[in-house]
């Protein structure tokens, strides 16, 4: 059964989850043209190829939590969502 605190505060589930993994790239085996493997695609992929760090940070002080989610759009815009959660 789910933890009552998680049901009451569904965002708390984010504290224990890892970010989704990016899709794996398919390996093209048996291609006769080796140069085609090393060519850069003309379009930018819609998902990152690797995630160096989690897209969110969690700070905890006494009874309060701060969850910050930072993402970048394809157009280069940075979006930051910051949630201040406090236990009453």
From Swiss-Prot:
UniProt KW keywords: Early protein, Host cytoplasm, Host G2/M cell cycle arrest by virus, Host nucleus, Host-virus interaction, Modulation of host cell cycle by virus, Phosphoprotein
Organism: Human papillomavirus 58
Misc: The major E4 form is first synthesized as an E1^E4 fusion protein from spliced E1^E4 transcripts, such that the first few amino acids of the E4 protein are derived from the N terminus of E1.
A single Gene Ontology CC term: host cell nucleus
Name of the coding gene: E4
Start and end residues of each stretch annotated as Disordered: 14-54
UniProt key word Phosphoprotein: yes
Post-translational modification, as annotated: Phosphorylated by host ERK. The phosphorylation triggers a structural change that enhances keratin binding and protein stability.
Top-level taxon of the source organism: Viruses
Full protein name: Protein E4
Low complexity: bias regions: 39-53
Pfam family, one: Pap_E4
């Amino acid at each position: 059964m789910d933890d009552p605190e998680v049901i009451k505060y569904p965002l708390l589930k984010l504290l224990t989850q890892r970010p989704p993994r990016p899709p794996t790239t398919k390996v093209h085996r048996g291609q006769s043209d080796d140069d085609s493997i090393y060519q850069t695609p003309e379009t930018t992929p819609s998902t990152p190829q690797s995630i160096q760090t989690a897209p969110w940070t969690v700070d905890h002080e006494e009874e309060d939590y701060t969850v910050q989610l930072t993402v970048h759009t394809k157009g280069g815009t940075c979006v930051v969502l910051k949630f201040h959660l406090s236990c009453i």
